[in-house]
């Protein structure tokens, strides 16, 4: 019986000691989390700049831009022509009643 009581007492003391140690452990504060976040973002930005300096990425961007321009130029010209036709039709409708 004494051994059982001693075991329960030892278990209680150990669990209380563990809880006390956990409370004393330093919790990360908001300032350190924000500083770590900004440091990570800065490192990511530096890596991105290093990658962007490479000629391969610049060549890909240039090819993409040229392809996009090739595809959009006819569409823009057609839209401009359609707009001019629409406005000229609208202007013709306005001038016809005035001449009658």
Swiss-Prot record:
Residues 1-18 form the signal peptide. GO terms for cellular component: spherical high-density lipoprotein particle. GO terms for molecular function: cholesterol transfer activity; high-density lipoprotein particle binding; lipid binding. It is found in: Secreted. GO terms for biological process: cholesterol homeostasis; cholesterol transport; lipoprotein metabolic process. SUPFAM superfamilies: Apolipoprotein A-II (SSF82936). Gene3D superfamilies: 6.10.250.100. Monomer. Interacts with NAXE and NDRG1. May stabilize HDL (high density lipoprotein) structure by its association with lipids, and affect the HDL metabolism. This is Apolipoprotein A-II. The lineage of its organism: Eukaryota, Metazoa, Chordata, Craniata, Vertebrata.
């Amino acid at each position: 019986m004494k051994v059982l009581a001693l075991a329960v007492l030892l278990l209680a003391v150990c669990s209380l000691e563990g809880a006390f140690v956990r409370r004393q452990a330093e919790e990360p504060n908001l300032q350190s989390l924000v500083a770590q976040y900004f440091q990570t973002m800065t490192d990511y930005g530096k890596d991105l700049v290093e990658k962007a300096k490479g000629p391969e990425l610049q060549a890909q961007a240039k090819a993409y831009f040229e392809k996009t321009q090739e595809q959009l130029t006819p569409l823009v010209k057609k839209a401009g022509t359609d707009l001019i036709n629409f406005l000229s039709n609208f202007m013709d409708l306005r001038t016809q009643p005035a001449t009658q």
